[in-house]
Amino acid sequence: MNFLPFACGGRSQGAASSASEGSRVASRVGSRALGAAAASFAMVAASLGPIASGAQATDARYYDGSSSERAAASCWEVKQNNPQGKSGAYWLYTPQMSAPEQFYCDQETDGGGWVMIGRGRESWTENYNGRGDAKQIHQNPTGFDAVQLPGQTVNALLNGTHPQDLPDGVRFHRAMNVNGTAWQDFKATRAASTEWSWTLRSTMYWSNISITHPRQYRGYNYYSQEKTAGNIFRYGYSDDFRSLHFVEKPSQGYKLGFTYGSRAKITGWFQDYLLNRTSSYIYRPANDSTTPLVFTQMFLRPKVTQNDLAAKGLHAYSQQGAPASSRRALPNSYSEKWKWRTSTDTGTGKKGEMNTQVEAITEVGGAVFTGGDFAYVESASGEKVEQAFLAGYEVGTGELRRSFRPKINGQVKSVEALPNGLLAVGGSFDRVNGEYYNGFVLLDPKTGQVAKDWDIRVVSRISSVPVQIKTLHVRDGYLYIGGSFTHLKGQTSPTYAYSRNLARIKLSNGEVDWNWRPVFNGTVNGVNASEGNSHVYVAGYFTQLNGGEAFRIANITNPRQSGGDWTHEPSYVPSSAQTWDLKNERKMWGFQFDVQDAGSSVWLGGTEHMISRYEKSSMRRTYSAITREGGDFQDLHLNGNTIYGACHCGDFIYQGATKVDSEWVNATDAQTIRLVAAFDKDTGQVLPEWAPIMNGAYGYGVWESFVDSTGTLWVGGDIRKSLGANGVQPTIGFARYAPRDVAPPATPSNLKVTKNGSKDQLTWSGISERNVKYQILRDDRPIATVTGTSYSV
């Protein structure tokens, strides 16, 4: 019997100091627990030799789910090994799980082998991380307060199978009366679901619908293989017991839950009062005439066996164990406790999506600076500081940098840290500390005083087009300045250079790059350069570059190039669009807000709800996603291998979608999005385990995201509330998300093994880190998780 840790990576490892006679013992670090609760795991490893007859290695029936050591691959395998077994709690394990866990298995319905993934009457969630204490599913399978497994756990139970490929689909077990004595089974396949998602309100394709009832309701039985798009299923005009809807109930505090159709007659005449009892399986409050919520259990039936686990590969541990493993670096889903916030009113007095409280964030000189349209900042203790449009906060503490007090008379739209330690500021202003600076200024990040090392000036010589600097970007020796303007001058010459809406300054001496002066016929919203500045990617409202067609985007390899070969297929084209002559298009559609170089790819975010990824080698689109109900993507930010995409969107993001208003047609799945989401920069896929919840006052969304030097993600825009670890917070203007713990714990040591009759007794020296759990691994899998420093097997 081999006790070994599963494969991880991270810190260096050391061997255990002792072992029983004839045994080789090693100790290795394990990994942090996956999921919302960041529990730690340290792995204990030992090679002890075989016990008994080694039945577990040769007889699949050994894995019957009766204990963590005998965890089965699925409820289906439990049923095959014990056909007479009853429904209840069983231990299951697949290699995608960190350790065996208990789940509720329905072994009596339709052949058995069903694992329950959620249950409840109200308060369901669409959050990928599920809801509540997962143990409550197998401990209290009929509880009314919804509990749902994390999406990561559901995917692990499937052992690599896509939900859309499950032969038996998803099973909804629903009460048919208020007493819970009659039940319906509704089975259906969600066609586009490459991974599990709780976004059941989203319009998606469902097929292979099978509805069965007890004898007295058998007239409602139904079966169809047809594919239908909707909020699960509506049974035509009848909309009765055969309909299955997942809805948000304003009459019940916007709680989510399942309902039948509006025409389902649940109680007899004059008995609707039965629905008002809190003990009813089908419930609505008194004085509520809407369709009631129905207690529902959800099941899947992955038919995974030990042979399937072996075929896909279990953990190949060496005699010395395995290296440590760390999770992907992402923020926590809960916002940090707020210390400062902006005013709810704008500093300019204007209202609109172009005048949100925070639109620009960067770090320089030990502080994070937030710029936008706000009148003052306010602390959690109630202190009000009259500082408009731009403020700084100490990186380590989040406290206001009180020495930084610039006086700016207009909205800040962009900020950028310069290598020389100065803060570049752009926007719609013309006075800074009483002096004339039109849309651009350099500040000392300690004091807020104008830094006069370089005298860089931006002007517009078109009277109807005021200066507005919307984007600043530093890359390999240059500062790129984009927005609305016609000319600018640098430090080395009083002469103004014509470089319309985009220019760059040499960071070596503050000089305008006279050899790089593109001309765009519309505002530049975003700019991002590749390494070495060989490619400069641009997004905005323009249709021309140097007189050639460049519809809303450009890939500049030569500043004198006319137009370009990078084209974008919009998610929506209005019927009145001048598609045959985009170069001279006057209607405003298809515009883009931001662009981000990401190594081998370029990301684009803009109008009509789309975010997309392009492969640099071909400039071909390889990924796209569309939000609904939602809005434009307004900001992109790269940190490591993760892209943060921000938008004015608040429900679903359809991955693979290409057209707005029919997102589900080409979608591979749908996940939730609440104003900002994380994406893998190389695959394009949403990283759904980061699932923040925030909202704003007007629906203008998030306009800036930035990861500081501590790994904390800052997001700014029209934000009024965010969900923190202790509840909803009034995070006005911006919110912060600290990095989740990804470092493996230290190595346990001094592992000893002694014989205690027919059992082996393992003991070891623990580590000092708090809340650590230890996993015991045998041969190719973990068999137990303990909080102490001993285990008997």
Task: Annotate each language-model stretch with its function.
Residues 43, 292, 727-730:
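Short glycine/proline-enriched turn or capping motifs at secondary-structure junctions
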Residues 6-9, 73, 103, 647-648:
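Secreted/extracellular small peptides and ectodomain modules produced from precursors
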Residues 31, 72-77, 99-103, 746-752, ...:
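Short small/polar-residue motifs
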Residues 2-57:
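Secretory targeting and sorting signals
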Residues 304-792:
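Extracytoplasmic surface signature
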Residues 56-322:
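Mature extracellular or lumenal effector domains of secreted proteins
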